[in-house]
Structure formats: C-alpha cells, structure tokens
C-alpha cells in the first residue's frame, strides 16, 4: 500500500531532512467537539451531503481514528519531525475549547506524540482582533507546546471594491492587520 511504502521509506531515512513537520490530522473539530457523521452507516461515504462531516468518524464511531493517526505518525515519523494538528476558525472561543480538548486527548493517549498546533489563520480585515488571537494562541501553546501559522491570509474589507481609488487604503488596512498579529 502507499502507506506502507511511504512510511517504510521514511523509516529507512529516504526523506530525512526534507520535512520539519507533518500535518497528521486536519480540521477534525467543529464547535467545541469532534466532527461526527450522523448519517446511516448503510450509506456510501462518498455521498455529497456528508459535507463537513467526517467519514472517518463514520467508520470508527469515535475519536480513535485521530488517536491512531498520531500513534502511527509517532511510530513512523523521524523523531526530528514535529507532528501537528491543524485547524481553521481557531480564534473562536467555542472552537478553541474543542481544539484544546482534541490536543489533550491525543497527548493523553498511549503511544502518541503531538508536538504543535497549526493555526490556519484565515482572518478578515473587518473583524480581526489581535487580543483574541493572542489569547487563543497562548491556550494552544500551553496545550500543544508549539504553535505555527500555517495558511495566514486576510480577507479584504467588505467595503473594498477592488478599484484603484481604494486599493492603497485597503492594502494599508491589510498591512496593519499583519502588524497587529505579529506584535501580539
């Protein structure tokens, strides 16, 4: 299988030094809990209506697939490669609770390793709060050990029409948001 081939090669050092970290599990939290799939087990997993639901939850009926992913990554990843959980919407207080719970659950399980949390960092110029960013980043650092911004971007303000007349002002707003974030 691809899994055996890749991890067999990784264990033999073929990819040494190529990666500093692995995104082991991505986007497994919704609200303050795990994403689940409440659709009948008799249904095909490729049904479009599953949407944001987790097909793996559909198979396992628990968070064990997340634990196993980190267990296998810990077993096969080179020890110098950091293992990440990565998610979006991470500045929302409710989602922060769910993400911290996932991190704590993984770290408490036997045979796992989780070194860092990846904040996808999709923000809006209109609603970005450096204070909120700092608050949740500190919670993630306490739970995971390290935090990384993995996909940082700022959506333009709702009033921006992409015309040349307002472009400089909009770019200034975006630059200011970046400054606030890095000063937090």
Task: Give residue ranges: language-model regions.
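Active-site groove signature of glycoside hydrolases
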Residues: 2-54, 84-88, 115-118
